[in-house]
Amino acid sequence: MVLINRVNIQPEELPLLYHVNSMDVYNLLQDIGSSKIIIDLRTKEQYEKNHIRTSVNIPPPPSTTPLYENGEIKEFNLSKYIGSNVTAKHWNLIFQKLIVYSDKPFLYNIDELEKTISTTTITTTATTTTTTTTTSNSIGSDQDIIKSLKVSDWDKVVLRHFLLKKKKTKVIIYQGGFDQFQKDYSFMCNPSSSPSSSSGGGGGSQLYPSEIIKDFLYLGGAENAGNRQQLINLKITHLVNMAGELDDVYPHLYKYYRANLDDRPKANIYEHFEPVIQFINDCKKQGGRVLIHCAMGISRSTTVVLAYLMKEDHMTYSDAFTFCKQKRSCINPNFGFVKQLKDYQQHLTLEWEKQEKLKKQQQQTLNINNNNTGIPLSKKLQLDVSDPLSNSSPSSPLISSTLPIPETPPAIILKNEVASPCPIKTTTSSTTINNKGQQQDKAQEEKDSIFSYADKQEKMTHPTLHSPIELPQSSL
C-alpha cells in the first residue's frame, strides 16, 4: 500500500482573473457546457443602442442618484445596486463564469488588486469575530458601502467588487471593448429594441458553430449546417458532412465533402482523415471558410478536426484535444475514434521522423560536397585562363594584361623551343620586322645567346589586350 502525505498536497492556484479576445467571447456565447453571465458596464443609452446578445447592463449610477454631487456619490451600496438586476443578483452563486466588458479597456494594476482583495478579505474576517470596522475606502465592509464613489472609476470599482465577491466564479474580462467585438461579430450584437435580445443576426436564438481557427475553420452540428443565415454571416464556402444520416442541405451553393459515417466505435473514420485534410487545405488555398459538422458537433466532426490539427500543426492527440476543447467544451469523440486518432498520431510521428532523417542526410551530403570542392590555386588559375575570350563562368575574373603565374619555374628555352607551361601562339602580324637583314641578325642573336623564360617574356609584344602573343619568325 502506498501512503500519500496529504500535508504536501496543495490545491492548484487559479489566476485572479482571465483575459479573452473577440473569438473567445464568440465561442463562450455558443458554449452550453457551463453557465455564464455577460455584464455590460457601459451607460444605459449605449447599451440600448447596441450590445452583445444575452448581456445584462450594470451602468454607472445616474446623476439623479441620492447624494450625487460633482461626479461622486456618497455612501453608495454597490451590492444592492448590482442586485437590483434580477439576472445579476446572485451571480456568484449561479454562474460558473462572469464575462465583463465596457466601451474601453480596463485599466488596473494586478498587484494592487491582489493586495487590496487580500487585505479586505482579512479585515472582513476579523470584523466578523471582533466587530472591528474597515477603512473608509474598503469595498468589503459588512454592508458593502463605498464612502465616496467616483463615477469616472466605475469600471475599476465594479471589477474589484466582482473579484472580491467571486467565490468559485471565474471572472473574465474582455479588453477589446464593445466596438471591437461589434466589428468582428456584428451578427452577435442586438439593440434593445430587437424582438428578442437573445437572437443573433438572423440566426434566431440558435447557437452558432464554434470557431476553432480564426476566420477559417468552424465546428458545429446539423442545425448550423442547415441555417442559411448563419452560413452567410460566417462567410462559409465549404462544408464537411460527417453524418451518414444527414443530407447535404445546399449542394448547389457550397462545396461538400460527404463521409456517410455512423457514430459507432467500429466505424472506419481513419480512411477519411487524409481526404478531409486535403479538402480543408483546398478551401484554405481558395481563401474560403469551412464548416465541419455531424449531427451534434461532438464526436464524428470533432474527430476529423483533431486529425487536421494533428497533421497541419504537428500536435499530439492530447494537445489537439485540449486546444479544441478550449474552443468547444462539449467535444467527446467515442473511444473507437480516439483509438484511431492515436494510431494516426503514430503514423504521423513515423512520417515526421523519416522527414527529419532525410533532411539530416541531405545536409550531410551538402557539407561533404562543400568540403570536397578544394582545388589547388594554380589549377584554378589555369582553368580560368584556358580560354581568355570566354566569360561564361560568373566567377571568372576579367582577363588581365599579364599572364598567369606558372606552377613551376620556367624552363630554359634553346633555339626555337617553346615552353610548355605557357600557351604561346606564333602568328604573323603587322608589327613583324620586314627587313630581312634584321631578321637574320635577330636569328643569329637567338643562336648565340641563352636567355631565361622570363627574359623571353619581356621581348614578347602585345599589340592589343586580346591579341595572341607574337614572337619574331626565325629564318632558320
Curated annotation (Swiss-Prot):
Gene3D superfamilies, A to Z: Protein tyrosine phosphatase superfamily, Rhodanese-like domain
A matching Pfam family: DSPc
GO BP: negative regulation of MAPK cascade; response to cisplatin; signal transduction; sorocarp development
Ranges of residues in domain Rhodanese: 32-190
PROSITE patterns attached to this UniProt entry: TYR_PHOSPHATASE_1, TYR_PHOSPHATASE_2, TYR_PHOSPHATASE_DUAL
Molecular function terms, GO-annotated: MAP kinase tyrosine phosphatase activity; MAP kinase tyrosine/serine/threonine phosphatase activity; phosphoprotein phosphatase activity; protein serine/threonine phosphatase activity; protein tyrosine/threonine phosphatase activity
Catalytic activity: O-phospho-L-tyrosyl-[protein] + H2O = L-tyrosyl-[protein] + phosphate; O-phospho-L-seryl-[protein] + H2O = L-seryl-[protein] + phosphate; O-phospho-L-threonyl-[protein] + H2O = L-threonyl-[protein] + phosphate
Region Disordered: start-end pairs: 425-476
Ranges of biased composition (kind: Basic and acidic residues): 442-461
Cellular component GO terms, alphabetical: cytoplasm
UniProt KW keywords: Hydrolase, Protein phosphatase
InterPro entries: Dual-sp_phosphatase_cat-dom, Prot-tyrosine_phosphatase-like, Rhodanese-like_dom, Rhodanese-like_dom_sf, Tyr_Pase_AS, Tyr_Pase_cat, Tyr_Pase_dom, TYR_PHOSPHATASE_DUAL_dom
Domain of life: Eukaryota
Record-listed E.C. numbers: 3.1.3.16, 3.1.3.48
Record's compositionally biased regions (Low complexity): 425-436
Entry function: Has a dual specificity toward Ser/Thr and Tyr-containing proteins.
Entry similarity comment: Belongs to the protein-tyrosine phosphatase family. Non-receptor class dual specificity subfamily.
Identification of the protein by name: Probable rhodanese domain-containing dual specificity protein phosphatase
Species name: Dictyostelium discoideum
